[in-house]
Amino acid sequence: MGRGRVELKRIENKINRQVTFAKRRNGLLKKAYELSVLCDAEVALIIFSNRGKLYEFCSGQSMTRTLERYQKFSYGGPDTAIQNKENELVQSSRNEYLKLKARVENLQRTQRNLLGEDLGTLGIKELEQLEKQLDSSLRHIRSTRTQHMLDQLTDLQRREQMLCEANKCLRRKLEESNQLHGQVWEHGATLLGYERQSPHAVQQVPPHGGNGFFHSLEAAAEPTLQIGFTPEQMNNSCVTAFMPTWLP
């Protein structure tokens, strides 16, 4: 009766698990040795137990040399990897440069076409597209210019309104100042006696006698200030001055 098929799963019993590991490890190392001898192959085997213990087999001169050989074939080695990365960067930069160069040339060609140059190589569709682009640019330019003009007009109207308000304020202050000066002058004239006197107060004759120059305080109902002669006194003085002294 043959052996049954062993189910591949983790052995729960610790002792059985260690025994199985030792047996299979030795068998694996034996198979690696046989393969290297029978087939003249360079074989390297590395095993770590669950406790971290290392078991290895190498048919070559050393495990390090075999690992370097493996890394060289798998990843190209450290130097080769760096060189490949540099080559990739150079190729990527070159591709980016070519894209930018083609874009610059396209923009320069479009600029010349917009200026009316190098139009001979363009077809009808390209010329129509160029015409539409120019019309769109003109509409945008005119719209922007109109907006700037409207903004300037609005600013000028705002400044005009501000100047009108300032002018009204100055006019109002000037009128108030003139009115205040008029009141001051009238008040000063009243205090100094320069206000206009009535004709009866000027030509009133004193009831008592006098020499024509001095009058009694009771002569007038209100005290007034009189400077110089009255018209009658001026006439009497002139007549007296021209009369001879021998006349009575």
From Swiss-Prot:
Its main location: nucleus. The keyword Nucleus applies. SMART domains: MADS (SM00432). The keyword Transcription regulation applies. Keywords: Developmental protein, Differentiation, DNA-binding, Flowering, Nucleus, Transcription, Transcription regulation. This is MADS-box transcription factor 8. GO terms for biological process: cell differentiation; flower development; positive regulation of transcription by RNA polymerase II; regulation of transcription by RNA polymerase II. GO terms for cellular component: nucleus. May interact with the K-box of MADS6 and MADS16. May interact with MADS13 and MADS18. Binds to FCA. Probable transcription factor. May be involved in the control of flowering time. Residues 90-180 form the K-box domain. InterPro entries: MADS-box/MEF2_TF (IPR050142), MEF2-like_N (IPR033896), TF_Kbox (IPR002487), TF_MADSbox (IPR002100), TF_MADSbox_sf (IPR036879). Pfam families: K-box, SRF-TF. PANTHER family: SERUM RESPONSE FACTOR HOMOLOG (PTHR48019). Expressed in lodicules, stamens and carpels. It is found in: Nucleus. SUPFAM superfamilies: SRF-like. It comes from the Eukaryota. Residues 1-61 form the MADS-box domain. One of its GO terms (molecular function) is protein dimerization activity.
